[in-house]
Structure formats: structure tokens, C-alpha cells
């Protein structure tokens, strides 16, 4: 009996691993810019993430975050947990825990409707249009009616009543994130995203490897096991890329991020 139960548990874990891999492949298909995630080596349910912001109130910021998927993911209705490991000042981020409020868009998880890339677009949306993210409704005259409650009430009040002070505060944090961009990794997980200054010598070497026939042959084999590699980002190049100004609001008039995420 124990042997049968153990095999069942193992098969569930394997199936879940393939489902998580499928989520990662969907993210690649979306081709999201300036936001990067990867499942940790230790657990497929714990993802490392980083977002670079080039425009708006948070321009120049770099925030790290973790995505914790529920144990029964993608089944059930429990929402994933998103924790920022870089200090963020935002109405939807709880100051004590740095956890992100998903309620403005997600009422519950539905595997046939939501994917991890929806979470990433939501993260992008709240930083791209923080004012839109706190709008509960819009009056016929076009005035926004702000939410009455949020994870960070201080940030909500400041953004609603003193826009200049809010921008000043988040820009101070942006400078802080730049200063600590190259700090040593806080995790020894092989998949932890490491950010290093752009190195032309390393870049050239990698490009030559990609052109190599032996490299193409090795990476095209479907049976190859996943490599234990350290994810790296050449941040100088990423930070120099300027995003085009958004042509439409990321939030629907009801204050929810539906327009940005569908």
C-alpha cells in the first residue's frame, strides 16, 4: 500500500512539473519586456523574478520579487503569493511583508482562464499606471474615484492627495534600487537571477557560442536534461532600452487591470 501511494504522489509531482514548465513556455510566447522570471532550482513552485521600469513615476527602478505557487497548482482557486524582496512603496504592496495585493484583478485562480504571465502583466500594470490601479470608478465627467482601502494606506493617501510627494518618494527608492542592483545574491539557488554590469568580452564569447554548430546541436536535443545554470541579465543594456510611451491606459475605467491583462 505504501509503495502504491508513494508512486501516486511521485506521478502527481511529475505532472505538476510539466504543468509549471508549460507555464514558463507560455511566458516566453508572450515576449514580455523588462520583466524576467524563472522557477527556482529547489522548487518548481518558487519562482524568482525581477522587473526593470523605464518610464512613469517609477522610472529607473529595479524590483526583485518571488512568486509562490500553491501546493496544488494549477488546480484549486487559491491565488499565488507575490512577495517583493526589494523595498517597494505602492498602495497595493503591504509595507510589513512586501506582499502584493492581487484582489484588484484576481478574485480566485482559474486554471482555464489565468496563467503566470497574467501575474507578470499585472505587476507591470500597477507600476506603469499606479493612479489607474487605485481608481475604483470614473465619474461621467471623467474624474476618478479612488479606492477607500489598500494594502498600504499611507501610499494610497499620498498618491491620492499629494502626487508630487509620491513621485519624489518612489524616485528616492529608484535611486536606492540602482545602488544595490549589483549586490551579492541573497540565495545560493543556481537559478537565482544575478545582475552584473555589461561585459563586452563575455557578450562576445556567448554570441560566438550561439553561432557554434556544436552549441546549436546540443541545445536542439529534446532529450537533454535541464542545465543547472545561473540566470544573468546584462542590466546596462536592459536599463538603456526605453519603452515606447503607452498608447492606451492599462486599467479599465472601473479601476481594474482587465484591459492590460486580457
UniProtKB/Swiss-Prot annotation:
InterPro entries: UBQ-conjugat_E2_core, UBQ-conjugating_enzyme/RWD. SMART domains: UBCc. It holds the Pfam family UQ_con. Residues 15-179 form the UBC core domain. Belongs to the ubiquitin-conjugating enzyme family. FTS subfamily. This is Protein crossbronx-like. It comes from Drosophila persimilis (Fruit fly).
